[in-house]
Amino acid sequence: MRMTMEEMKNEAETTSMVSMPLYAVMYPVFNELERVNLSAAQTLRAAFIKAEKENPGLTQDIIMKILEKKSVDVNFTESLLRMAADDVEEYMIERPEPEFQDLNEKARALKQILSKIPDEINDRVRFLQTIKDIASAIKELLDTVNNVFKKYQYQNRRALEHQKKEFVKYSKSFSDTLKTYFKDGKAINVFISANRLIHQTNLILQTFKTVA
């Protein structure tokens, strides 16, 4: 049975999403290791990237096994969200033009606000303010994306438009998750949705970096 284009896109999204722990958890570890042993860190980083590409989700499985063996009781989804605000060099746009650097800044701002959700969610007043800040940050990021579209022409504009639509879709999904949260109080679903939105934010940067 052949998959439809939409199913293929969904599968690709799921595949890349499970690889999130590679850059959110392991990249900072590699960066620290580089200070001690640059060669070993680079070798280990390359090995993890290759293994993750061939077996999406492998990094997450390894981390979970280590936590299990050490009997560490941790909410992995929540922890991932807390760590996901850091810049990922592979996604940062290197072009020096102000519009592209602004895109980096707006993406960073959104990810940082989203990563604070676990600290804010139990304080209703602060969390409501955080939600407003997230909405503003989403709008600012989309405005910046549109500014880049206006100023620069791309051969692969379709890929950029698609990624923008995906980002909007996950932004709306995040909004719907928040509405449900205020009814059922299940914070874990908010964390999952926030992680997905951070992932989409990184994919916007990655797409622009690839075609720019």
UniProtKB/Swiss-Prot annotation:
Promotes cell proliferation. Modulates apoptotic pathways. Increases mitogen-activated protein kinase activity. Important for cell migration, and for normal structure and assembly of the Golgi complex. Important for KDR/VEGFR2 signaling. Required for normal cardiovascular development. Required for normal angiogenesis, vasculogenesis and hematopoiesis during embryonic development. Promotes cell proliferation. Modulates apoptotic pathways. Increases mitogen-activated protein kinase activity and STK26 activity. It comes from the Eukaryota. It is found in: Cytoplasm; Golgi apparatus membrane; Cell membrane. GO terms for molecular function: protein homodimerization activity; protein kinase binding. One of its GO terms (biological process) is negative regulation of blood vessel endothelial cell proliferation involved in sprouting angiogenesis. This is Programmed cell death protein 10. It comes from Gallus gallus (Chicken). InterPro entries: PDC10_dimerisation_sf (IPR046409), PDCD10 (IPR009652), PDCD10_N (IPR048288). It is a peripheral membrane protein. The gene is PDCD10. Its main location: cytoplasm. One of its GO terms (cellular component) is cytosol.
